[in-house]
């Protein structure tokens, strides 16, 4: 995962989604020791601390660390990569929270400083294993991230693309390193592809073309709601709770488009939440 400077827009957008994050995450916390991995600007970490937990934070970006250190009230702040949690924290945690990070682990991989960095699902599996090592028995792992649509390979269509949308599509297609996500066909103002590929493009589009040098590199949706549970079970976790949500901001940002699948109006869920317990 790169440690390049994150633009202020990134922190602003992450901060504006705090209400959704807090609503989804806080009710499932177990304490007292909670670690927020990929804490960014620290809005969620601060909310965790404010709820009475002994909150610690981890992030790889130096500017995120500067923000986190400026918050005050956090137990520990460490700079590093997600799979390095056992190396950076000596005591086990009661809960590890990972919000909007596992897709970055997939997209950018583990620390480039390690002897054999890994990418993709190998990086996800390694990171889940390392999280388990850092949890007490019965401890919780809470993942909030993109969720792949059910029946992800079924076709979907987007009609009504604007000239700016079409320009963004060509830029996205040029930048994306993920063949499955580039399986899209543009005809006039209409775009067709799998539900998964369509959803990935639409959500990236909401960030704006100026963010594509970073955002188009990422694969946001790694698993369907059910499949994440199966994968985590293989790593020694039991599912406690899962849900998917569609954030209104995404719907509003894309309201000029007509999105259909199977001949019916369709809009993909924007986030999933998975609460696991260490077996």
Which ranges hold each PLM region?
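Class I SAM-dependent methyltransferase Rossmann-like catalytic core
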Residues: 1-18
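Conserved alpha-helix/loop element of class I SAM-dependent methyltransferases that forms part
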Residues: 13-31
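Conserved beta-strand signature within the Rossmann-like core of class I S-adenosyl-L-methionine
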Residues: 138-145
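Short alpha-helix
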Residues: 219-236
């Amino acid at each position: 995962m790169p440690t390049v400077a994150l633009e202020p827009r990134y922190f602003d957008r992450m901060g504006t989604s705090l209400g959704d994050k807090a609503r989804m995450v806080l009710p499932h916390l177990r304490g007292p020791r909670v670690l927020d991995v990929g804490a960014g600007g620290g809005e969620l970490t601060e909310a965790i601390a404010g709820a009475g937990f002994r909150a610690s934070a981890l992030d790889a970006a130096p500017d995120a660390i500067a923000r986190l250190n400026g918050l005050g009230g956090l137990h520990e702040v460490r700079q590093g990569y997600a799979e390095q949690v056992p190396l950076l924290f000596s005591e086990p945690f009661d809960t590890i929270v990972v919000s909007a990070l596992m897709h970055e682990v997939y997209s950018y991989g583990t620390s480039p400083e390690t002897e054999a960095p890994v990418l993709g699902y190998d990086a996800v599996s390694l990171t889940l294993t390392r999280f388990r090592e850092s949890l007490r028995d019965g401890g919780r792992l809470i993942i909030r991230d993109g969720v792949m649509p059910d029946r992800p390979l079924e076709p979907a269509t987007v009609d009504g693309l604007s000239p700016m949308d079409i320009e963004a599509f060509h830029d996205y297609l040029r930048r994306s390193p993920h063949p499955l996500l580039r399986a899209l066909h543009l005809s006039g103002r209409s775009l067709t592809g799998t539900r998964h590929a369509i959803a990935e493009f639409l959500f990236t589009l909401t960030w704006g073309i100026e963010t594509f040098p970073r955002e188009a590199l990422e694969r946001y949706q790694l698993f369907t709601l059910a499949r994440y549970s199966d994968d985590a079970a293989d790593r020694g976790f039991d599912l406690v709770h899962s849900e998917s949500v569609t954030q209104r901001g995404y719907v509003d940002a894309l309201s000029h488009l007509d999105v259909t699948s199977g001949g019916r109006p369709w809009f993909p869920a924007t986030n999933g939440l998975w609460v696991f317990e260490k077996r």
